Regions:
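Boundary at the C-terminal end of the N-terminal hydrophobic targeting segment
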Residues: 18-23
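Bacterial N-terminal signal peptides that target proteins for export
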Residues: 1-7
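Extracellular attachment/recognition segments
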Residues: 24-226
Length: 226
């Protein structure tokens, strides 16, 4: 049975209010590191999840985030193991967890960052000396990214593989750019989600205000073998 450890901070993780001169720290202390920046993900009082992946043959070695508001709490999902290390606690992708815990900012958002290191630098889990079940990976995440088009309506249906069942589903709205999206921009994208017969149906509506910007919706499915 796989257990997930939600860590609000791990060595290089530091969430700060976004500022034009802020240099993120996802690669701090790492000799070989490829930085990867995600979009500005809209935050709300309900938890939002967003997955950011490393290039092939790399694993997550550091994390950071920019915040448009200090009222946003950001953490990530890590796996159990010892020592807490790239390749053990983290894998080739990181799932960020964001929530607006203070204030009523309708345009609150966070921008996830990961620092990627060569996969060979990660450790391995040490076998235990007894025969109890160690934390495993009974579920898999299926992530889809849908481009949002201005002034239109788009429907998208996501599902797990044929030999899997759907456990949970979440979606997130993101805007790529160096600065957080404005309130008028965030109000221009609306997403509704329905689950029926193991399928997740998204209805995405976008106004003309997003023309000239790059907006996406990420659908995150948690699937398990039947």
């Amino acid at each position: 049975m796989r257990r997930l450890l939600i860590l609000s901070a791990l060595a290089t993780v530091c969430a700060v209010a976004a500022a034009p001169a802020y240099a993120t720290n996802e690669c701090r202390g790492l000799q070989v590191c490829v930085p990867v920046a995600g979009p500005w993900v809209l935050a709300s009082p309900g938890e939002v999840q967003f997955q950011l992946a490393c290039p092939k043959r790399f694993v997550v070695g550091g994390l950071d985030a920019e915040l448009s508001s200090r009222g946003i709490d950001v953490g990530f999902v890590g796996s159990l193991g010892s020592p807490v290390n790239p390749g053990i606690t983290t894998s080739k992708a990181a799932v960020f967890l964001g929530r607006l815990v203070r204030g009523r900012d309708s345009a609150a958002s966070f921008r996830p960052h990961i620092g990627c290191v060569p996969a060979s630098g990660g450790g391995q889990r040490t076998p235990t000396a007894y025969h109890a079940f160690a934390p495993g990976k009974p579920s898999v995440r299926r992530v889809s990214q849908i481009t949002v088009r201005p002034g239109g309506l788009r429907r998208y249906v996501g599902r797990c593989a044929a030999n899997e069942k759907l456990v949970a589903a979440t979606h997130a709205i993101g805007f790529f750019g160096d600065a957080p999206p404005s309130a008028s921009l965030t109000r221009s994208v609306h997403v509704t989600q329905r689950i029926a017969a193991g399928r997740v149906k998204l209805t995405i509506r976008a106004g003309r205000a997003i023309a000239g910007s790059r907006a996406i919706v990420q659908l995150d499915l948690l699937c398990a073998p039947r």
